[in-house]
Amino acid sequence: MIPLNSNLTQLKRSAIRVYTDLARRTPGCVMLTLGEPDFDTPAPIRRAAWDALEQGQTHYAPNQGTAELRAAIARAETRRGNPTAPEQVLVTVGASQALFTALLGILNPGEEVIVPVPAFSLYETIITIAGGKMVPLDV
């Protein structure tokens, strides 16, 4: 068997998953753990996704994101007062992937990352997998 990355041996089960499991087992408990919407995806979004599939948009997008999406994000950022070119935009599936990708790109083994706490529990996992050490900063 191929040995796992030694950083993985330092990981603990995510506290948010522990609390989510507990909430699911507790009758009448309101779950405020994962930040997941309590409604289905709106119909216009589902229709747009279906239309895209019907038009053959079934392949991987470019690594940085589609040119159209990157241009739209750049325009939105520019309107917010942050002049941005599409070439400066990298699209990810969410904030966690963005943080993970950024830290893998800049963090060297053993470097410390200061994180204001309380914080989302996945941050420590991301830092650990990237080879760093989380330093909590009470705020």
Protein language model features and the residues they cover:
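PLP-dependent aminotransferase-like
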Residues: 104-139
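Short, hydrophobic alpha-helical packing/hinge segments within bilobed ligand-binding/sensory domains
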Residues: 98-99, 123
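Basic/polar N-terminal segments that are highly enriched at the extreme N-terminus
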Residues: 1-3
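N-terminal small-domain helix-loop-helix segment of the aminotransferase-like
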Residues: 9-94, 101
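N-terminal amphipathic/basic leader segments beginning at the initiator methionine
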Residues: 5-7
